[in-house]
Amino acid sequence: MVSYLTSCLSALSTLLLLLGSQLVCPQPSTEHRKVPQRMAVTEGTPEDSGSGSPGVWGSWGPWSACSRSCSGGVMEQTRPCLPSSYRARGGSRPNGRALSITGHVVSAVRTSVPLHRSQEDQRALAGSNASRQGPAVVRGSRHPQARGREPSERRSRTRGPIGPGKYGYGKAPYILPLQTDTTHTPQRLRRQRPSSRHSRSQEASASKQGYRPPTHQFSHSQPLYQSDSGPRSGLPPSEASIYQLPLTHDQSYPAASSLFHRPELSSHHGARPHGAAQAFPQHLRSTAISCIGAYRQYKLCNTNACPESGRSIREVQCASYNNKPFMGRFYEWEPFAEVKGNRKCELNCQATGYRFYVRQAEKVIDGTPCDQNGTAICVSGQCKSIGCDDFLGSDKVLDKCGVCGGDNTGCQVVSGVFKHALTSLGYHRVVEIPQGATKINITEMHKSNNYLALRSRSGRSIINGNWAIDRPGKYEGGGTMFTYKRPNEVSSTAGESFLAEGPTNEILDVYMIHQQPNPGVHYEYVIMRNNAISPQVPPHRRPGEPFNGQLEEEDRGQEDREEREKNQEKEDSQVEAPEVFTSESTQTFPVRHPERFPSHRPDNLVPPAPQPPRRSRDHNWKQLGTTECSTTCGKGSQYPIFRCVHRNTHEEVPESYCDSSMKPTPEEEPCNLFPCPAFWDIGEWSECSKTCGLGMQHRQVLCRQVYANRSLTVQPYRCQHLEKPETTSTCQLKICSEWQIRTDWTSCSVPCGVGQRTRDVKCVSNIGDMVHDEECNMKLRPNDIENCDMGPCAKSWFLTEWSERCSAECGAGVRTRSVVCMTNHVSSLPLEGCGNNRPVEATPCDNGPCTGKVEWFTGSWSQCSIECGSGTQQREVICVRKNADTFEVLDPYECSFLEKPPSQQACHLKPCGAKWFSTEWSMCSKSCQGGFRVREVRCLSDDMTPSSLCDPQLKPEERESCNTQDCVPEVDENCKDKYYNCNVVVQARLCVYNYYKTACCASCTRVANRHVGFLGSR
């Protein structure tokens, strides 16, 4: 054994000096098989080419633990590829257990992956793998040339110049402090290391984001198979169509398998189970097995939102590198998102306060969003879209009625037109939108002065509520987003509309604010039929059937991959490193393009000696300033300007002196990040309140501020340095029509006395056409009727005969007659019109003495209850006994044998004519600080038909002020904060939006009351 180790060390020293490459010493083996023979089998056996014997898929294993505890993690499910004869013997394993085959374990569950791995762990892992597998290399880094190299050489070989003034790109391994850096001693580096309090804060923030920070220790939770650099074939594991079972230990584990990767440390630590090896005959253990289809699938999990921590999942992952030295120094890292394509799932972090970034990890944590605005997430370094069934890579979408994977057969379209004639002003319900409705379209048939409004069944106003008209835009309500459109008042004839995709999570009511005749409202939405079944759960797939029914391209085999890797390494060794010249220094750095790196290389290869950069030309590209910022405020963009300069003198020369292919591509840089000053955003004028003459029009004026190319509504006091534009203005569309007298007065209605005469008065437009009276000003209308006096008429008394019956059956009574003053034309006049010599109307009569006779006594009739029209009048009726000189009042039953005279009768005086009628007052528009209420006033004649004969001066008011008292804050039990961090909503000034006003009702109400008090004190 000692001689064997001595020979290995001697061979290692010789090859390091001569070739600068890596030598792997094999461990002593009892099998006495030569290494070249083993390598020959690996490279030449047909089993590695992907054309092995066909296998069958086993049962799906259990789902792995979710990669995140909140905000959307990923679960993985795998299945083993078994020999076709294994199923025939009934060898299926229940519960989806992992299948062990000759020392290699195929895991059905992939657990969480630590964020980092320390150098001690990597060395321990390399030693463990070497002891278990014999002649093998430890893989995991795609940049093996960066290991074992001096710090200065390592900087010159990174992918792009990493230095001030330019972004860099490359992998950042954990390195020790620079040996040549005398200013950063170990003691000083320890002082620069973040404190334990900072580390604890990072761990707490990480736990809020749904995962635990790495402990940098191997445990049983590590995956048994893990891909650090991806398969050499260039296909991700989830996209390969041929799944190959690992070869037996006798034939060597395939180092570049397209789907299986090197085994990490597990709980066995060198022990090899033999149970699975005994389950297969010898001829199967020496043959590769391939299955068609995907061997694993992913599903979204734990979609509940994480508690607010102020940092995203990428920020937490980058911050976990704050206590790790990079290039001999400590930095604070933040995400660098300005990458495209397949780099979105890499962990690219930018050093805070510095203008360079580093790829800290080739893959982010599973479940990390690919970008800030999209819905796709990263899984195993690949950006995957999410289907409506929460399966990654699924192509299922919602149909019209919101059924995942549905074919619209269970959908029902509900549509109609609301054409009811409305009479009173205010809100009138149009249609009810049920829960679960999709494809919602509410549109006015024609343009009008009416407004559409939207309210939830709970009473919360979403659009145009509380007599306040909102601007067109997007409003959230009922679990969906409504688009409120209001057409241009001049060029469009279409009416208002509400549009939403749905589905709604509660019942919504659509209202119309009625101001003029209803032009009709068309409504349409889609709901699911009652008997429709929503296929939310995807059907179970048969073994061997690929996910979503898609077959993928077959693997081209192990030999093709190794051949491509050899060619790629040869090309990399011959490619010249281009040079980039920066303005901060005259030093040049070779740039390694990411696509030219080999897909996989061993980590323990000894890199060749570094070569100095080529300086074949005397001129370089240099950054000389930047372009002007695209905006003066609110986050603009600018680009660096590169010019051709002399290498030594730095003098600018024509661009033809430099190689145009080496000119750096200008990258966009943010500038002028401070927000723009607030300004008044002026809306469009509403329609004039009158069709002719002077009227009023209104517009909305909001204080807004622009930042990051977004216009936000802010509090009005931010615009107090500017004069606020007027919100109301007078308007006149045209000159109103005028009154015109078409005829002279008619003759008086009576030949004598006082009568009436009339004339024809019409409303005429400015072009001479007769129009409705409403087009003219009713207050300026000339009289079309007046009284006329034709002089006194001859008059005399007209009398009737005396009544035949005395008013009393016994005793003294009277007889009466009617007396009327009449003109010679038989027209009635007041009694005073014929003078004072009025004839008597009653004369006494006596039917003899009374002897206690019982009778009903009636009093005189009262005046009529009304002055005009039909009314009533009353009189007293009592039962009395009449004696010779006195009357005795008796109980009514004493006269019950006699017919009782009526005590009430109808009376009718002169006709009333037209009068003003009004409705009850509406509710006040505000409960405090001055609102208004309205009512409808109409002129009606005696038969209750509309008339225009009422006196305009006596018309009652149609609108009046109400609730002028100051507002007193009231405690609403339903007004509560639904989230614990509503103070952030208040600080961000988001209370102007209905969603946050409801979610943080208590906090927003307190701020609004303070703001009102502040304005009142000024």
Swiss-Prot record:
Residues 187-199 have a biased composition (Basic residues). The keyword Secreted applies. The gene is Thsd4. GO terms for biological process: elastic fiber assembly; microfibril assembly. This is Thrombospondin type-1 domain-containing protein 4. Residues 558-573, 592-603 have a biased composition (Basic and acidic residues). GO terms for cellular component: extracellular matrix; extracellular region; microfibril. GO terms for molecular function: hydrolase activity. Residues 1-26 form the signal peptide. It holds the Pfam family ADAMTS_CR_3. Both isoforms are expressed in the embryo from 7 dpc through 17. Isoform 1 is widely expressed in adult tissues. Isoform 2 is detected in brain, spinal cord, eye, kidney, stomach and uterus. Mainly observed in fibrillar extracellular matrices in elastic tissues (at protein level). It comes from Mus musculus (Mouse). PROSITE patterns: PLAC, TSP1. Residues 34-56, 116-240, 534-623 are annotated as: Disordered. Promotes FBN1 matrix assembly. Attenuates TGFB signaling, possibly by accelerating the sequestration of large latent complexes of TGFB or active TGFB by FBN1 microfibril assembly, thereby negatively regulating the expression of TGFB regulatory targets, such as POSTN. Residues 54-307, 676-737, 739-792, 793-851, 852-911, 912-968 form the TSP type-1 domain. Isoform 2 interacts with FBN1. Isoform 2 may interact with TGFB1. Residues 971-1008 form the PLAC domain. InterPro entries: ADAMTS_ADAMTS-like (IPR050439), ADAMTS_CR_3 (IPR045371), ADAMTS_spacer1 (IPR010294), PLAC (IPR010909), TSP1_rpt (IPR000884), TSP1_rpt_sf (IPR036383). Keywords: Extracellular matrix, Hydrolase, Repeat, Secreted, Signal.
